[in-house]
């Protein structure tokens, strides 16, 4: 007891010492030094008892009364003017609090006194949100019955049904949503849509009329950043909203986006170069208030922002330099514009002059042709040189040349000039003045080889006047190709009716069309070089200027005699006004010297055709190998020829031959003047005359000449077909050979003029007087010729397009067909005789011509014998028993079907076995997996038990230690009690 009293005295002493220390500190404080009046002025008035009186605001008193459920006090406060919708610091009203407290009586009392059932707190929660979250079904029903909205969203974009956890509450709210027809998605996006509309309006008006929130000072940019309205954020930034605007607490939009973890909003603000180091009133940066998972993203955005800021600075410097350069270059542009305006009247005058010269040259060519190539060059040289107006703002264009064409051409020079007049301005230049260096670079040529040729030929051209180089990409090539396709269609129709011979019309046309197509594809410089080499090889002087190297509508022959020129003019007038197939049926008028245009061409036909064939061979493109098709067609053709030739020579054939021979004799008597030597000289010089435009120069006189067979075949074909006249549709040549006068001559004139010595009527009888030796020799020659012809035939058939091939079906014999075939055979014999006369020399004798006729007859008989053997083979093939073949094939097919069915059955059996094996394997694997799963579960259960046991062991050790400690304390207390008891 004495010890306890001693301890109590010590405690009292220490308490007195602490109190004394407090008094000492009070005496030295500033409060103790203030006057007593000031200290008492700020205190509450004293009551009677002397204690101060505390006063609360009316709103706080009202909320406290509602919370306590004192309805009488609430009525008194409402009577004194208290606001029933007053809120506390969190925005909660009395209705919110009554709903949270589940006080249905107070809820009814407040609603009856006109409390707002849709009032939202600071987080956007309405009383219905609170009731749905707490699960108070009766309060929620009461709110709904009294007009509470089920579509209001809180700050998180949640409607009351999203907060409901109990199924009954969720069903109630969803049913009400359907009943009221509320679109929840639209409700969630309503705020964003409203902000989007306002942002667009501000962007269009250029004026931002935003109102800060009264409580926090937040702006629309803060709300868009915090809620992740990316589109609204972009529009506000585009409208010029201040990126670093701060609310009342100093928070920027980046603070809000970082705090609420909106990554996209942070990226948009950072890319817009907002300040990422700005601090709020508490000294916090966006990194300090950011969500933990967003800090790294903000650091990356800061690095990216530094790069963007540096790029923007360099871009601004470049823009300033560009503006300076544009200001400096404005002066030069204005000067060049003035120069351009001065040159415009000159270009208009030059266009008018070009049109006049084009029309005059076209009319002149329709009336007559030029006498030599020099006249063509002079007219071409009279045309002004074209240049392109150059300025800094216009792209350079290549110069094109317009050359007047004949009236038949669908693409005339005047239309070409109209086409190019809108694209080019052509100021007139002095003719003796060389163009400047920068204008020379605008010339367009076929290839770089053209430049050297232009440089070499510039001096002589400048003497005659400024020349125009035609562009290799001239639009006239397309017109030429179109006309060539039309002509090919007509010729293919003719060739289908003509007899199939080695040198038939269709074959020659096929070869020449292919050659012309290849030549058209080549560039201008290549063809120009080719013509130059061939001219040197023929040793004929060439005076063609480079200005007309692709002028396919103006080529004329440079070397002609006066008589040839007259014949050319006459034939040209006829060809320009009469269609091709009509001209073929009439002889041309004679010239002043009595020489027709027909024998002029008949001298060098065969030799030139051989030479042309040898030269053309290198220009043909490789073709596909269709050996099977060619063999089939050759076999069918031989069968048809066998059917024709085995009939023998009929009376109709003999009558036709007599009529032809008598007609030729009468014409030969009408032309009694000997023309052998003039024919030779004129044929060498004037044969390359062109009555239609051609792409081949004049130096290839004999090269493009076609064989006799072409003219001989075309004459009877045109007689039979009676080609309609087409004056409105000109025939443009596709190859050199189609532009030769051989198309305009009559076949009987051709072979009549071959014979310089008149034949006697005994030519019919001498045909049958050949010897056996000559027969054998001719048969050997015929075998060689047939072998060569078969090879060429297969090559020709491989080249022929499918649309031009004849049908190979069964032919039915008719009388008309037999007569036609007979006439064709007679014409073929005449063709062979003429070719022998032609190869025999320039002065053939009558006996040689008779021998050729006999040899031709012998060859024809040998051919008939060979074809007869082929026919017998075909008949043997036709005698096969196709019924047996069909039956054997049918039985074989049936056997194969049975084998196929057996194989299918075996395959199905094997598949079923494989499926069974796979199923067994799957079952085994599933059993194994189930066993393994059970083992894993048992292992996990044992591991859990072991862990629980270990925890229990730990608790047990702790309990043991606690028990030991309690025992020790108990012993100590016992000892103390024992001492005190003493």
From Swiss-Prot:
Q: In which tissues is it expressed?
A: Detected in skeletal muscle, fetal and adult heart, brain, placenta, kidney, spleen, thymus, pancreas and lung. Isoform 3 and isoform 4 are heart specific.
Residue ranges of the ANK repeats are 57-86, 90-119, 123-152, 216-245, 249-278
Q: Any idea what job this protein has?
A: Regulates myosin phosphatase activity. Augments Ca(2+) sensitivity of the contractile apparatus.
Which residues lie within the region annotated Disordered? Answer: 1-50, 342-517, 556-579, 606-864, 918-948
Give a yes or no for keyword Metal-binding in this entry: no
The protein's location, in the record's own words, is: Cytoplasm, Cytoskeleton; Cytoplasm, Cytoskeleton, Stress fiber
Give the GO biological process terms: neuron projection morphogenesis; regulation of muscle contraction; signal transduction
Keywords recorded for this protein, A-Z:
ANK repeat, Cytoplasm, Cytoskeleton, Phosphoprotein, Repeat
| Organism this protein belongs to | Homo sapiens (Human)
Mark the residues carrying the PTM Phosphothreonine. 445, 646, 808
Protein name per the record: Protein phosphatase 1 regulatory subunit 12B
How is this protein annotated for GO cellular component? A band; cytoplasm; cytosol; nucleoplasm; stress fiber; Z disc
List the molecular function annotations (GO) for this entry. enzyme activator activity; enzyme inhibitor activity; myosin phosphatase regulator activity; protein kinase binding
How is the subunit organization of this protein annotated in UniProt?
PP1 comprises a catalytic subunit, PPP1CA, PPP1CB or PPP1CC, and one or several targeting or regulatory subunits. PPP1R12B mediates binding to myosin. Isoform 3 and isoform 4 bind PPP1R12A, but not isoform 1 of PPP1R12B itself. Binds IL16.
Bias category Low complexity: which stretches? 411-421, 466-478, 731-742
């Amino acid at each position: 007891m004495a010890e306890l009293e001693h301890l109590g005295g010590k405690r009292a002493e220490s308490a007195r010492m602490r109190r004394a220390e407090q008094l000492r500190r009070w005496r030295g404080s500033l409060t103790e030094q203030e006057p007593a009046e000031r200290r008492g002025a700020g205190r509450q008035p004293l009551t009677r008892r002397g204690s101060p009186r505390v006063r609360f605001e009316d709103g706080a008193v009202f909320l406290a009364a509602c919370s306590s459920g004192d309805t009488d006090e609430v009525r008194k406060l409402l009577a004194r003017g208290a606001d029933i919708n007053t809120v506390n610091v969190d925005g909660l009203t009395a209705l919110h609090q009554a709903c949270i407290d589940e006080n249905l009586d107070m809820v009814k009392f407040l609603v009856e006194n006109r409390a707002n059932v849709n009032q939202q707190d600071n987080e956007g929660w309405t009383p219905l949100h609170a009731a749905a979250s707490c699960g108070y079904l009766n309060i929620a029903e009461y709110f709904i019955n009294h007009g509470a909205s089920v579509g209001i969203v809180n700050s998180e974009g949640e409607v009351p049904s999203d907060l409901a956890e109990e199924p009954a509450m969720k069903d109630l709210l969803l049913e009400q949503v359907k009943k009221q027809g509320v679109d929840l998605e639209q409700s969630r996006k309503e705020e964003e849509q409203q902000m989007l509309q306002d942002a667009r309006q501000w962007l269009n008006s250029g004026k931002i009329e935003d109102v800060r929130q009264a409580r926090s000072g937040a702006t629309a940019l803060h709300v868009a950043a915090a809620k992740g309205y990316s589109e609204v954020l972009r529009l506000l930034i585009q409208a010029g909203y201040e990126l670093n605007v701060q609310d009342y607490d100093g928070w920027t939009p980046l603070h809000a986006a970082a705090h609420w973890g909106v990554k996209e909003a942070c990226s948009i603000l950072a890319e817009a170069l907002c300040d990422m180091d700005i601090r709020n009133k508490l000294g916090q940066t966006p990194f300090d208030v950011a969500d933990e998972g967003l800090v790294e993203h903000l650091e990356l955005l800061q690095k990216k922002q530094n790069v963007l800021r540096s790029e923007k600075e360099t871009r601004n410097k470049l823009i300033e330099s560009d503006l300076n350069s544009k200001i400096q270059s404005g002066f030069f542009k204005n000067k060049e514009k003035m120069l351009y305006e001065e040159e415009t009247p000159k270009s208009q005058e030059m266009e008018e002059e070009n049109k006049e010269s084009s029309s005059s040259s076209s009319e002149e060519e329709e009336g007559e042709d030029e006498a030599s190539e020099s006249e063509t060059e002079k007219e071409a040289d009279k045309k002004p040189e074209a240049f392109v107006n150059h300025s800094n703002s216009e792209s350079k264009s290549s110069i094109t040349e317009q050359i007047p064409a004949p009236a038949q051409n669908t693409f005339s020079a005047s239309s070409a000039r109209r086409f190019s007049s809108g694209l080019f301005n052509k100021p007139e230049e002095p003719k003796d003045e060389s163009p400047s260096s920068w204008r020379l670079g605008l010339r367009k040529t076929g290839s770089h080889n053209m430049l050297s040729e232009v440089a070499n030929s510039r001096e002589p051209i400048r003497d005659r006047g400024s020349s125009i180089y035609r562009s290799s990409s001239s639009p006239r090539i397309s017109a030429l190709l179109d006309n060539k396709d039309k002509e090919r269609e007509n010729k293919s129709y003719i060739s289908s009716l003509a007899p199939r011979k080695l040198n038939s019309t269709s074959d020659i046309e096929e070869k020449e069309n292919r050659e012309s197509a290849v030549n058209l594809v080549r560039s201008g410089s290549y063809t120009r070089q080719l013509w130059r080499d061939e001219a040197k090889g023929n040793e004929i002087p060439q005076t063609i200027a480079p200005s007309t190297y692709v002028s396919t509508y103006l080529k004329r022959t440079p070397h002609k005699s006066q008589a040839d020129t007259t014949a050319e003019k006459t034939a040209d007038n006829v060809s320009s006004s009469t269609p091709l197939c009509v001209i073929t049926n009439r002889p041309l008028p004679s010239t002043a010297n009595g020489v027709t245009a027909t024998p002029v061409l008949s001298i060098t036909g065969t030799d030139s055709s051989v030479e042309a064939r040898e030269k053309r061979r290198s220009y043909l493109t490789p073709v596909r190998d269709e050996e099977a098709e060619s063999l089939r067609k050759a076999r069918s053709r031989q069968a048809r020829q066998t059917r024709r030739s085995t009939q023998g020579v009929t009376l109709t054939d003999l009558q036709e031959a007599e009529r032809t021979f008598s007609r030729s004799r009468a014409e030969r008597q009408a032309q009694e003047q000997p023309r052998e030597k003039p024919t030779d000289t004129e044929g060498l010089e004037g044969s390359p005359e062109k009555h239609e435009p051609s792409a081949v120069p004049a130096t290839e006189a004999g090269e493009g000449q076609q064989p006799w067979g072409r003219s001989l075949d075309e004459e009877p074909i045109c007689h039979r077909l009676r080609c309609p006249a087409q004056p409105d549709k000109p025939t443009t040549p596709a190859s050199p050979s189609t532009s030769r006068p051989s198309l305009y001559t009559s076949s009987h004139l051709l072979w009549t003029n071959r014979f310089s010595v008149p034949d006697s009527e005994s030519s019919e009888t001498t045909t049958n007087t050949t010897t056996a030796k000559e027969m054998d020799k001719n048969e050997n020659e015929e075998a060689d010729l047939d072998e060569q012809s078969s090879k060429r035939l297969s090559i020709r058939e491989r080249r022929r397009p499918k649309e031009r091939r004849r049908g190979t079906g069964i032919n039915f014999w008719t009388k008309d067909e037999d007569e036609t075939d007979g006439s064709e055979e007679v014409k073929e014999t005449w063709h062979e005789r003429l070719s022998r006369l032609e190869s025999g020399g320039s002065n053939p004798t009558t006996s040689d011509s008779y021998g050729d006729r006999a040899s031709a007859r012998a060859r024809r008989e040998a051919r008939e014998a060979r074809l007869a053997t082929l026919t017998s083979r075909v008949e043997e093939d036709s005698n096969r028993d196709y019924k047996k073949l069909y039956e054997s094939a049918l039985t074989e097919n049936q056997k194969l079907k049975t084998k196929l069915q057996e194989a299918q059955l075996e395959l199905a059996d094997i598949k079923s076995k494989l499926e069974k094996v796979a199923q067994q394997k799957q079952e085994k694997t599933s059993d194994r997996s189930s066993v393994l799963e059970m083992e894993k579960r048992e292992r996990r259960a044992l591991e859990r038990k072991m862990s629980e046991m270990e925890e229990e062991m730990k608790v047990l050790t702790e309990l043991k230690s606690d028990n030991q400690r309690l025992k020790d304390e108990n012993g100590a207390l016992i000892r103390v009690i024992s001492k005190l008891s003493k």
